[in-house]
Amino acid sequence: MVVRRKKKSPKKYRGSRTHGGGSHKNRRGAGNRGGRGMAGSHKHKWFHVIKYMPDHFGKRGFNRPPKVVREPNTINVGELDALADKLLEDGIAEKDGDKIVIDVTDERLKPYGGPFDKVLGGGHVKRPLVVVAPEFTERAVEKLEEAGGEAREA
């Protein structure tokens, strides 16, 4: 058995006029390759499709209508902590002893990007806040409780 010890060098077609394309007339137009791109994929290139792109044709699943898909409006606990004094001034938040109560579902939060559906755990909480919201992340609840506040589900 012959063992090739030296790696075969790739053929660069130096000095060749047509680089393996047959006659110089053959490379003209798209007829030489059976059409451009995906042309003929439902006809003469069908075997290529079923071998290399088996899922290319046909429908699978469905797309939900955009008006049904609703991304939750979120805010970080750090942002609430930073806004707390301003919200107290505007009468959106209330003081309950040493705690500040903020209802993030309040329509009056529109100038601040609200009302919010979910409270996330980003940022630092330096004072006790009682936050009322439909949803919280675990980290948000941890941070609020560490600062002496609480998370209330709306």
Curated annotation (Swiss-Prot):
Basic residues bias (residue ranges): 1-30
One Pfam family per UniProt: Ribosomal_L27A
GO molecular function: rRNA binding; structural constituent of ribosome
Subunit structure: Part of the 50S ribosomal subunit.
Known function: Binds to the 23S rRNA.
Family membership noted in the UniProt record: Belongs to the universal ribosomal protein uL15 family.
Protein name per the record: Large ribosomal subunit protein uL15
Taxon lineage: Archaea, Methanobacteriati, Methanobacteriota, Methanomada group, Methanopyri
Gene (UniProt): rpl15
